[in-house]
Regions:
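Cell-envelope and extracellular/periplasmic
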Residues: 1-194
Length: 194
């Protein structure tokens, strides 16, 4: 059943599905004017794990190629899937949409570089142990302070944190600080490349 609120945000609850895939899913939207359908062909049911955190969780397989070269020559596994949530800074509240397309990709030699290393080995172990599809939702940002993962209501218990974050309410100031941070992070990633 689907539930749609006054702002158009929606939630859908599915009956339990047998682990496996790929399945096809059709989503229909009916309005006074017409009915629209959207069909997805690449849908799997199984276990989904959130891989969240800082640099240790973010550390990509790309940087582990020298240590685990055989992982990059393994047979592709479309049932071990990864989705990297793009990093976007927003100091005005939670985001409900992405600015760019986001997709799930199966583990293969041409996609493995982007997988979180910890997530990949964990997911592969679960796949081998239970034989079900595994999805890894990668929500990571190296060097991010814990406060950046907390909502404003929680941070209210530490007024100093809210004071420190106040300059970021100005979009121009936030952009300048974020660009500087991203440049430093990019340099760090370049230094890691072997």
């Amino acid at each position: 059943d689907a539930i749609v609120d006054a702002d158009g945000a929606w939630t859908v609850t599915l009956e339990p599905l047998d682990a496996g895939g790929p399945y096809r899913m059709t989503v229909s939207e009916t309005s006074e004017a017409a009915t629209r359908e959207s069909l997805s062909h690449d849908v799997y049911a199984g276990e989904v794990f959130i891989c969240a955190g800082q640099s240790n969780m973010e550390y990509q397989m790309e940087f582990l190629h020298w240590r685990y070269p055989s992982e990059f020559t393994r047979e592709a596994d479309s049932l071990l899937r990864h989705c990297k949530v793009p990093v976007r800074f927003d100091f005005h509240g939670p985001r409900h949409e992405f600015d760019e397309p986001v997709q799930w990709v199966g583990a293969a030699s041409d996609t493995l570089d982007e997988f979180t290393g910890i997530g990949y080995f964990f997911g592969r172990m679960i796949r081998e142990s239970f034989g079900v599809p595994v999805g890894l939702l990668n929500i990571t940002l190296g060097g991010s302070p814990i406060e950046s993962w907390m909502d404003e209501e929680t941070l209210a218990a530490w007024p100093r944190m809210l004071t420190d974050l106040a300059p970021y309410r100005n979009d121009d100031e936030a952009r300048v600080r974020n660009e500087s941070s991203i440049e430093a992070r990019t340099r760090w990633h370049e230094d890691l490349r072997v």
